[in-house]
UniProtKB/Swiss-Prot annotation:
GO terms for MF: G protein-coupled receptor activity; melatonin receptor activity
Record family assignment: Belongs to the G-protein coupled receptor 1 family.
Sugar attachment sites: N10
Induction (UniProt): By cocaine, which increases the levels of day-time expression.
UniProt protein name: Melatonin receptor type 1B-B
UniProt keyword Ligase, yes or no: no
Cytoplasmic-side segments: 58-72, 127-148, 213-244, 300-347
GO cellular component: plasma membrane
Originating gene: mtnr1bb
InterPro entries xref list: GPCR_Rhodpsn (IPR000276), GPCR_Rhodpsn_7TM (IPR017452), Mel_1A/1B_rcpt (IPR002278), Melatonin_rcpt (IPR000025)
UniProt topology in membrane: Multi-pass membrane protein
Keywords, alphabetical: Biological rhythms, Cell membrane, Disulfide bond, G-protein coupled receptor, Glycoprotein, Membrane, Receptor, Transducer, Transmembrane, Transmembrane helix
Length: 347
């Protein structure tokens, strides 16, 4: 009980700080824009990623071992939409945090779970693409349905382990500038550097290596005259690769500013933190938030099977009987089909 009272007092202080630093200085239109962006992000996040998961479940062409990574990534994006984002909206509308320490810690934990889970799943997808295109002979053995489930389980186990140190470092707290309980970059300079390197730079390096190797192979194959070399990379495989490459690029663009700010602040928190313009910090955070709703849109724009399934699902919503019938038929069709790579057989 005393801890809750102390936290509420601190939260009140933070609320005053937030009003001093930004909330009172921000015009009503700025707050309305932030709320509108987050509402849009949350709605599209929920609807889009549910469409992804249902599409994989319903469509035999999408239902394969490799697409487990895609579903896992969709789940990571859904985590923030169901809990942290609504609490951020609550803080925006109430100009501060009044939900207590427990809610703050849970929100910060789930935010981290979603972010790191997304990074690790995107890395897993890149490695999957690399193995399928560059090491196709070993792919079937490496990515059996059982092995894929184990790899996804490993990804989430590593994600949880990566978040746990935050509770010991004390880096999860309410930041009034972004109305969110989140990772505090000024809690520990060394820990901030480790977080940026391990949770962002290393995965980005791994994904970049995988996709560069794929691009090199694609270029080499296109220059070959032999038919057997050209057939190694089918047009559908290339389109699928481009889809996931776009997902990666958008993730990197949305999260790079915030991670760069973290590295700059870590150099000397007391000196550098006040020099970071508040508008830049807020924009970088909301760019990161916005990324959670983009993947489902990319699948729909660049992938014909996902696009068709989206239309079928949205149409069937108006005819519930048809939806139930088609879903039941899909659930019993092709469940034991040969495992294939992420978004394989899609156009």
């Amino acid at each position: 009980m005393p801890e809750n009272i102390a936290f509420l007092t601190n939260s009140t202080d933070l609320g005053h700080v937030g009003r001093a630093l930004g909330s009172s200085a921000r015009p009503a239109w700025a707050i309305a824009v932030l709320a509108s962006v987050l509402i849009f992000t949350t709605v599209v996040d929920v609807l889009g990623n549910l469409l992804v998961i249902i599409s994989v479940f319903r469509n035999r062409k999408l239902r394969n071992a490799g697409n487990v990574f895609v579903v896992s990534l969709a789940f990571a994006d859904l985590v923030v939409a169901f809990y942290p984002y609504p609490l951020v909206l609550y803080a925006i509308f109430h100009d501060g945090w009044s939900l207590g320490e427990t809610q703050c810690k849970i929100s910060g934990f789930l935010m981290g779970l979603s972010v790191i889970g997304s990074v690790f799943n995107i890395t897993g997808i890149a490695i999957n693409r690399y193995c399928y295109i560059c090491h196709s002979f070993a792919y079937g053995r490496l990515y059996s349905f059982r092995n894929t489930l184990l790899l996804v389980a490993l990804i989430w186990a590593l994600t949880v382990l990566a978040i746990l140190p935050n509770f010991f470092v004390g880096s999860l707290s309410y930041d009034p500038r972004v109305y969110s309980c989140t990772f505090t970059q000024t809690a520990s300079s060394s820990y901030t550097v480790v977080v940026v390197v391990v949770h962002f730079l290393v995965p980005i390096a791994v994904v970049t290596f995988c996709y560069l190797r794929i691009w090199v192979l694609v270029i080499q194959v296109r220059r070959k005259v032999k038919s057997e070399e050209r057939s190694r990379v089918r047009p559908s495989d290339l389109r699928n690769f481009v889809t996931m490459f776009v997902v990666f690029v958008l993730f990197a663009i949305c999260w790079a500013p915030l991670n760069l700010i973290g590295l700059v602040v870590a150099i000397n928190p007391e000196v550098m933190a006040p020099r970071v313009p508040e508008w830049l910090f807020v924009v970088s955070y909301f760019m990161a938030y916005f990324n959670s709703c983009l993947n489902a849109i990319i699948y729909g724009l660049l992938n014909r099977n996902f696009r068709k399934e989206y239309v079928r699902i949205m149409t069937a919503v108006w005819i519930p009987r048809r939806f139930v019938t088609e879903t039941s038929r899909a659930a019993t069709d092709g469940m034991r089909s040969k495992p294939s790579p992420a978004i394989n057989n899609n156009e």
